[in-house]
Amino acid sequence: IKLIHTYKENQFQEGVLEDYAYLSKASMRLFQATGDESYFDFSKNITDNALKLFADDQSDLLRYSNNNELFTKVISLDDGVIPSPNSIIAEQLFNIGHIIFDDEYLNLSDKMVSSVQDIIDGNINSYSVWANNILNRVEPFFEIAVIGPNAKSITDDITNYFTPNTIVVQSKIESIIPLFIDRYFEDETYIYVCQNKTCQRPETKIDLALEQIPYIN
């Protein structure tokens, strides 16, 4: 997948890192909201392509553009008027790694966050998304997977709760996504609270499931 930033009168400009980062995050949010795995696949593909196109050979971060003009080698870091595309990609890698149980994505995200740690410490107000990335590492992080025929309605109800340091995902069908494998039952919908590739006892009620996350109660 290759994105086009602008197109006018048969002239086009190739997409920059912001285009890939924001589209990847938007697609991930659609996956979380609908359970449609095509959105997850698209989000992952966009993120993978961003890593290939914008890799910087002198750091663990990503460049603004993949052409060789000097100004495009700039690496955007601050979460100012809009979040840094690097902070968004770090967040995406973290979420993808937790959904597919892939340490490579998690390690790439860790390297990106570690490389800006000193900058963030001195001016956290300008690095809010980076700070959230750090928070996901300082406190335990959980996956909340809602799986079964009523996954959509239960997931919608869970969004009414404050659930920091979690990612909430859903599936109403049997799936090969690692977080969902062998957890689908056609006659019941279960809520799984998982951490470090292991899920706790599945629950059918939201309050009982969230009790498994210590800082929510």
Predicted regions, residues:
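Glycan-recognition and catalytic cores of secretory/periplasmic carbohydrate-active enzymes
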Residues: 1-217
